[in-house]
């Protein structure tokens, strides 16, 4: 990766969770965008949303992993899906990148409070 890329202002994608809801994804507890990973019926919607962000000018897309931390998953009774959800988020982002190879993928991390300390 050319680190000079980040010496200029770059455009990232937008708020994925709200966009997925606006496009018809049903809310599921406090999973937000992780709900699109959990249910295969939303995988295409998630991919299409990544692609639309890219078409709108995003140079970097962020994986939908903001709410895939263990404590959030436990609160929603899907803690056993931790690995699957994080892998699936990367796979779907990679599909978008395959169509637009110049796009970069960033991993989405939640705020530190009650997130990474429980991994």
Regions found by a protein language model. Name each.
Residues 117-119:
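Conserved small/polar residues in nucleotide/adenosyl-binding loops
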Residues 10-13, 61-63, 105-107:
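Hydrophobic faces of well-ordered beta-strands that scaffold small-molecule active sites
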